[in-house]
Amino acid sequence: MGLDPDTEAAAITAALRTLAPELTTVPMIKTSRPFYGARVGDLRATAAGWLRAHRDATPAELAELADRLWTTGVREEQLVACFLLARDRAALAATGLDRVRAWTALLDNWETTDQLGMNVLGPLVALDPGRRLGLLEELAGDPHPWARRLALVAATRLARADDPARWWPAVAELLLRLAGDRQAALPKASSWVLRSWLEPCPDQVAAFVDANAGRLPAVAVRETRAKLATGTKRPPRPPGGRRPAIAGGRP
């Protein structure tokens, strides 16, 4: 007998309520979504425990369970959905891009957006960038600002794909397309993308930042140049003084 995703989703919901039993809309982060207030570490442990207890679950069943959890719109259930898929590569591969695209309708804060991008969409696109990069381009043009942020966060994981240098030009175009966007903390997300790509493509990223310093967000230019120079996004603070400013970018 196969796994019933509705029953399993209800069991996970019950477990999450015991971690933080009062459903609340008072935000830990700026969100209109309900949440229980459970810690991220407990959510990861919940996902890991479920997988240990259901080793016979098929990839399709796990993908369906993740969908049930995500579409509740509750923070903890959405994050458990991400962590389930992140721990099971076959289930991730069984999660269609159309399904993840539909999930973006429930994004309204940086936490769930970033967890979806890091754990699900980014790794999913990295499995087959040639066929799947188009979704990031589509999301970059979405009127929903959190969908646009999702495109950038997912691009950080493409730096781990096979032959990453092949995909850098597409990521660079994505960055330029969103360079002037100030919604959903997109300037900081641009910095994250650039710094993620320094490991596989340091020369290309450095040249890109130099060539486009006037277009890219100032924080992205500053933090990327700092990481190139020091290994961290923040320049070292001199004894008794402020950290030096790094030239480039818009004021």
Residue spans for each PLM region:
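Alpha-helical scaffold domains
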Residues: 1-251
